[in-house]
Design a protein with these regions (language model features):
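Short alpha-helical "recognition helix" segments of helix-turn-helix
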Residues: 21-28, 89
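RNase H-like two-metal-ion nuclease catalytic core shared by retroviral integrases
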Residues: 195-197, 206-250
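Mobile genetic element proteins and their domesticated derivatives, centered on retroelements
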Residues: 10, 35-38, 75, 89, ...
Length: 299
């Protein structure tokens, strides 16, 4: 719908007759149908009479339907139970026989003060997401500073399961191996490991001469795990792990949904349906880890 100022401009210019209809429409950036509709409706009226008529007219579009109170209570309850976003909550309620769009869910959450608004609008990414087909085919790992300590996360690429994590005073190869050993003993041995060129994972060459492998590289080699290195200065390669770091920090420091990393990891793996998985079945990373396991790997 055009603003009051533009409508007044259309009517005034059409009445004066100095410009053609096409020129007026181009100046006001109005379509042909919009131009003639406003001319028919407001022809001969002054700015103040147009404002008065607009104030008395009904807003365009269908009137919004009132959301039943039981639906509103169900939305708030799901949010408190699962900490999920509007799309996942809408899917959950549809499974329970409550038909409600994710837009209405978002509106209810926003009115209840349960939406964490972004300080800056994020632009759509231009690259295409990639992922492995089977669980244990590829794990990603990285370090991040969190509350004065170093946090490491190991993520299964296919299922988005957080296979291991640890919080340490320093980011070292030994601590990386410790967390990886625990993850392997719990979930199994991956075929490949994706890391950056960080010193904890890779011994870079010095002055053009090849360096000897560090402890992490030797551990991967001894366990038959293929080491895949991300491109230099390209954090998107390990973007899934970076996203997990953001999730942990946001849920603890901004939204205050949880108080510890362990709580966030349990919620991510066992409770929250992941939007990159089978959302129609509200699949969690733990469920996807079992479903995507290769038949030769299953016990």
């Amino acid at each position: 719908m055009l603003s009051l100022r533009k409508i007044s401009f259309l009517v005034r210019q059409h009445r004066e007759g100095e410009l053609s209809a096409l020129q007026i429409r181009k100046l006001a950036k109005a379509s042909k149908s919009t131009f003639y509709r406003h001319i028919r409706q407001f022809a001969g009226l002054s700015y103040y009479k147009i404002r008065k008529r607009l104030a008395q007219s009904k807003p365009p579009g269908r009137p919004a339907k009132q959301i039943p109170m039981r639906h509103a209570r169900a939305v708030i309850q799901k949010r408190l139970e699962t900490k999920a976003n509007d799309r996942i909550i809408a899917k959950m309620l549809q499974k329970e026989g409550i038909k409600i769009s994710h837009c209405k869910v978002y509106s209810l959450l926003k009115s209840a003060g349960m939406v964490c608004m972004l300080s800056k609008r994020r632009n759509r990414k231009k690259w295409v997401r990639w992922q492995r087909k089977h669980s244990l085919s590829l794990w990603q790992t990285d370090w991040s500073l969190f509350r004065g300590k170093w946090l490491i996360v190991i993520l299964d690429d296919a299922s988005r399961l957080i296979a291991g994590w640890g919080l340490f005073d320093s980011a070292t190869s030994e601590n990386s191996i410790k967390v990886l050993k625990e993850a392997i003993s719990t979930h199994g041995r991956p075929k490949a490991m994706l890391t950056g060129h960080d010193v904890q994972f890779y011994a870079s060459s010095k002055k053009g001469k090849p360096s000897s492998k560090n402890a992490f590289q030797l551990f991967l080699e001894a366990n038959g795990i293929n080491h895949i290195l991300a491109r230099v200065n390209h954090p998107q390669t390990c973007g899934k792990v970076e996203r997990i770091f953001g999730e942990i920090k946001t849920r603890i420091e901004r939204r205050h949904d949880f108080s510890t990393v362990d709580e966030v990891v349990s919620w991510h793996n066992e409770i929250k349906p992941h939007m990159s998985l089978n959302l129609d079945e509200l699949e969690t990373p733990a469920q996807a880890f079992q479903r995507k396991m290769h038949h030769k790997t299953k016990v």
